Amino acid sequence: NWMVTRINATLETKQPRQYFIGVLDIAGFEIFDFNSFEQLCINFTNEKLQQFLNHHMFVLEQEEYKKEGIEWTFIDLGMDLQACIDLIEKPMGIMSILEEECMFPKATDMTFKAKLYDNHLGKSNNFQKPRNIKGKPEAHFALIHYAGTVDYNILGWLQKNKDPLNETVVALYQKSSLKLLSNLFANYAGADAPVEKGKGKAKKGSSFQTVSALHRENLNKLMTNLRSTHPHFVRCIIPNETKSPGVIDNPLVMHQLRCNGVLEGIRICRKGFPNRILYGDFRQRYRILNPAAIPEGQFIDSRKGAEKLLSSLDIDHNQYKFGHTKVFFKAGLLGLLEEMRDERLSRIITRIQAQSRGVLSRMEYKKLLERRDSLLIIQWNIRAFMGVKNWPWMKLYFKIKPLLKSAETEKEMATMKEEFARVKEALEKSEARRKELEEKTVSLLQEKNDLQLQVQAEQDNLADAEERCDQLIKNKIQLEAKVKEMNERLEDEEEMNAELTAKKRKLEDECSELKRDIDDLELTLAKVEKEKHATENKVKNLTEEMAGLDEIIAKLTKKKKALQEAHQQALDDLQAEEDKVNTLTKAKVKLEQQVDDLEGSLEQEKKVRMDLERAKRKLEGDLKLTQESIMDLENDKQQLDERLKKKDFELNALNARIEDEQALGSQLQKKLKELQARIEELEEELEAERTARAKVEKLRSDLSRELEEISERLEEAGGATSVQIEMNKKREAEFQ
């Protein structure tokens, strides 16, 4: 984990990111003969990712059918992996018990196994006791994963979960002469390193974080990122286990397809509608297949247009369904529509090319005909002239003709010149008028085309605005439903929060009561210890006093030789029992009196001995009772300490859960506010669209009036330039 943190810190660019493309490459389920802690982490990750894939590909796919109003019978694929995931990650699950065991210094792998069996064996269907087979590694428990049953060996799990760094090795690296190595460990703070004031708690808490906790935290972050993206899934299939080229192991491939959920995906694709397109996009892209199905010049709703277009095509009408906002296709139909569209485009382009080539060829042929006619006329005239050029009468005609009617010819020439001048002037005026009318006609036609384009654009804008309006209304309905759902979820979360708060208060009260009981027991224990110390002091004092009495008795025994043996036996008995005596105050007084009266008689000595033995037995019984009560109190204290630790652990878990619930509640409230703001924005946009639509309608009516006026002006100007207009119409027809 330390190495992963260092690598991430080195690769981090600290630049703002808004969009990203991520590639997640992970090994699949690992089922070996010997499976340890690493395999559990990898298989747990695969369980989460497989659940995400199943939810995204199967559950969300069928939920979209229901949301869009498609008639669909829900297919339960039976691939809910939540039971196995809860067994691993939930409180009192495998990882939770492993983290709890890492806190206790006397915990071992076997105590971890015992707790697993106590909590889950026979209570969870996914947790089983393995059968150890001779010749294979020992297994301590088995889990039923999505890909199969995996036997796990738990030896060394506690040490792996703690993942400690050796302090001595780290200190050696920090003092290394290699600059890179010393920089890597420069910021590492070990257990013996000085901690700044106010930061010690955070350092200590973070250093105790286990590998399983970090793995779960990173996995939760990964799943959050995946849920915020549009994922695409790629499955890798191993063809054979021998790595041989061109060899496919059919059972192995089918097993992988079944484990990966590919077979279920194929079932959904065959029965469902994997391809979908918005109505507007479908109408715009596939209208070319049958333009007559959607008439020009009138507004038709996108859904109705798509329905008319699909009903007019020669396809299987059971292969598609209409939703609220999209049209859904079965697998293969969209590819067929694409082929039909490509074929239609190919025919249209071929026809355009043929017409263009025909027009060019006809123009070239017309030029050839005109050239041929001109050449024939010129040749005929030249041949006729050459035939009469040398005829005598023609020569005479050429000589006499200029002399005849010369005066009349001159008058005619003058008249013709005047007429030519008038005609030329009239022609120039007519040409000028014609050019003026042509320019005016061209400008009017240009205005007409511009107005038609503008009207068409406004009609398209109006159609788009109506589509957007319908879409906004649908979005508003969906958002209102989401807001209602969020409100219900928020109420449920508030109720859960209130219940958790009540539980927390109850646990706090129990904890305070337990603390008071512990305080009382500690006070009682302190009192008992004080009494014990006082008793020991009394015993010591009595021992010293009895030593003095021994000296006195020794002096008296010289005078009482007859009683020496009995007296010495009594002293030996007292010396043997002096370590166990606690309270001998009464015995001391009686003993002093008996010592003073010892010279009296032997009977008094025997009486003293009997009293001492009775007091000794009483003190031994009291001492034994006191020791037993002390042991009971210590056991009670240890049990209360264990209960207190357990309650503290549960309280911390509840506090963390309450904080998560509060954070989720705040996020839901924030999202609710964002949705309300979005609804207000959509309502404002809807109002703006309505205003723009009214303006477009008004502009459309104004343009229609202007177009009618222009048409009237064109009709008025058409009387003077009817011939020119006909020519212009012919030109327009040719260009069209």
From Swiss-Prot:
Domain Myosin motor: start-end pairs: 1-342
Phosphoserine: residues carrying this PTM: 701
Alphabetical GO biological process terms: adult heart development; cardiac muscle contraction; muscle filament sliding; sarcomere organization
SMART domains: MYSc (SM00242)
Positions of the UniProt region annotated as Disordered: 716-736
Coiled coil region boundaries: 403-736
Pfam families in alphabetical order: Myosin_head, Myosin_tail_1
Keyword match Mitochondrion: no
IQ domain: residues covered: 345-374
UniProt region (Actin-binding), positions on chain: 219-241
Residues that span the membrane, as ranges: none
Subunit composition and interactions: Muscle myosin is a hexameric protein that consists of 2 heavy chain subunits (MHC), 2 alkali light chain subunits (MLC) and 2 regulatory light chain subunits (MLC-2). Interacts with ECPAS. Interacts (via C-terminus) with LRRC39.
Misc. remarks from the entry: The cardiac alpha isoform is a 'fast' ATPase myosin, while the beta isoform is a 'slow' ATPase.
Family the UniProt entry places it in: Belongs to the TRAFAC class myosin-kinesin ATPase superfamily. Myosin family.
Domain comment as written in the entry: Limited proteolysis of myosin heavy chain produces 1 light meromyosin (LMM) and 1 heavy meromyosin (HMM). HMM can be further cleaved into 2 globular subfragments (S1) and 1 rod-shaped subfragment (S2).
Record protein name field: Myosin-7
Originating species: Oryctolagus cuniculus (Rabbit)
